[in-house]
């Protein structure tokens, strides 16, 4: 009925406002004025319909103190912008959600690229109890590729220091990348690339 439709709109808007964040059903339920069970059920519906997906935390028996909560992303960043009322690219550029929506876009595009090729995307994120985080950990062929996503045109070497956290894992770390607003492909150092967003 109409009341349920309004509740669902509030719900999906609350979900969109949290794209790129760790899932918190209690907060979503509070903002949508529904209970947690309903919020979890509706999240399942969104996932089943291919509207959202989860990025699970990377885990390894040699890495300690890792978080266990997945992060939530939308396949369509245009839907996120519509629901969170960003009317143009110009207003979003200066808005509070620009970093989150850029991250959502990059993660979704990488995932869709794998799926469109008929491959399973082994994508994760890294976050420990000290809030140290790597946006994407790509696992393939027995190696890990760490990726940071930043809304900057001039990424510095400090952005890739966090990649060293993966060196304690049993799976070896390979080349990393910072995906950012720089127009051309280049290197940040001998082990890490600077990749412009438009390439993905």
Label every model-predicted segment:
Residues 115-116, 164-173:
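Arginine/glycine-rich "motif VI" loop of SF2 helicases in the C-terminal RecA-like domain
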Residues 139, 145-154:
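Active-site ExK catalytic segment of metal-dependent nucleases
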Residues 172-180:
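Short, hydrophobic beta-strand segments that form beta-sheet elements in well-ordered domains
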Residues 153-163:
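Active-site-adjacent loop/helix micro-motif of nuclease/hydrolase catalytic cores
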Residues 122, 175, 191-193:
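Conserved beta-strand segments of alpha/beta enzyme cores
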Residues 182-200:
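Domain-level recognition of nuclease-like catalytic cores that cleave nucleotide substrates
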Residues 81-82, 156-158, 185-189:
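Switch/connector loops and helix/strand junctions flanking conserved nucleotide-binding motifs
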Residues 1-144:
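Accessory nucleic acid-recognition modules appended to NTPase machines
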């Amino acid at each position: 009925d109409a009341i349920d439709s309004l509740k669902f709109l509030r719900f999906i808007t609350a979900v969109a406002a949290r794209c790129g964040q760790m899932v918190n059903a209690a907060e979503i339920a509070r903002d949508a004025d529904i209970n947690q069970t309903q919020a979890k059920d509706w999240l399942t519906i969104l996932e089943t319909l291919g509207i959202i997906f989860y990025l699970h935390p990377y885990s390894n028996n040699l890495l300690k103190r890792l978080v266990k909560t997945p992060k939530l992303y939308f396949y369509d960043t245009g839907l996120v912008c519509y629901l969170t009322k960003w009317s143009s690219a110009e207003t979003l550029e200066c808005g509070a959600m620009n970093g989150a929506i850029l991250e959502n876009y990059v993660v979704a595009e990488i995932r869709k690229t794998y799926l469109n090729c008929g491959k399973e995307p082994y994508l994760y994120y890294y976050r420990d109890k000290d809030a140290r985080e790597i946006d994407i950990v790509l696992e393939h062929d027995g190696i890990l590729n760490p990726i940071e996503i930043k809304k900057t045109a001039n990424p510095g070497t400090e952005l890739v220091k966090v990649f060293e956290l993966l060196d304690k894992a049993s799976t070896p770390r390979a080349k990393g990348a910072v995906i950012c607003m720089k127009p051309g492909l280049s290197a940040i150092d001998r082990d890490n690339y600077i990749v412009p967003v438009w390439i993905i």
